[in-house]
Amino acid sequence: MKKIEAIIKPFKLDEVKEALQEVGLQGITVTEAKGFGRQKGHAELYRGAEYIVDFLPKVKIEIVIGDDLLDRAIDAIRRAAQTGRIGDGKIFVSNIEEAIRIRTGESGLDAI
């Protein structure tokens, strides 16, 4: 099993969710996040004063899937989240040793 963590622009969430559903994924976890990468922060005006905003709003998507869906899920996220501009985000993949459904006690792929 693999865990995909994708940090994307918030306005791309619906497109990514739909793309993942088309691949056959049944559930995702979404968390609001703030961060910066190469694009750093940006300046905003508020009541005539300029402020530097260090952290930009992002959305973090977490998915645990079987190894067989990994490449399709990554491709779906990339295609749906890409704008071609700085700050499109990152995708991280890690191994999951075990998954357990709390309600039923199912484990492994049956739990996801």
Q: Locations of the language-model features?
A:
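Positively charged, small/polar-rich N-terminal and surface patches that mediate targeting and assembly
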Residues: 1-112
